[in-house]
Amino acid sequence: MKAKKRFGQNFLTDKKLLEDLTSLINVSSQDKFLEIGPGKGDLTENLINFCDCYFGIEVDRDLLTVLKNRFPKNKKAFINRDILKLNPSEIYPLNKFRVIGNIPYNISSPILDWCEKHYEKI
């Protein structure tokens, strides 16, 4: 599947880089993750096998189908939504969570603003 310019998509495919990123974030079995724009799920694969709970927020419906077919549904959820319109309490009502993502450059500032707005949960 090709990246869609209108979503500012870029896909991480370098296996070594994905392994290095996973190592740097030090995933633990108690972690709860919110991944912004999981894309085809290459980074996702390194998270969901090791964390307690995972949610991926993907705005592209075509990629959502890819993700749902690639990963089992137990304790993992993929939501078709614009991250900027998401209230994190909808998915993590009581818990703090970690945010990760290969975010599109064209909305990186608004995403950082969203993170700042919801800092108590992150």
Model-identified regions with their sequence ranges:
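Catalytic cores of RNA-modifying enzymes
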Residues: 1-122
